[in-house]
Amino acid sequence: MDNMDRLNYLYEQKNTLEFKINIILTEMGLIKREDDKYEELILDCNKLSLELHNIEIEIIMRGGVLY
């Protein structure tokens, strides 16, 4: 697996995780924006997305090499 494959794998994992989170939220019936718990979960998802984005930036800054 080369570095580009690894980066693509990370993107796939991020997309899969976001998809699973959306399914869970839908199944729980948390579809109303005014629901405090829903807002809390959205914030958690946004934090996770930001962390994944920071990891991607770190990988790119290291020349695409995963350690």
Predicted regions, residues:
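Short, charge-rich amphipathic interface segments used for partner binding and complex assembly
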Residues: Q13-Y67
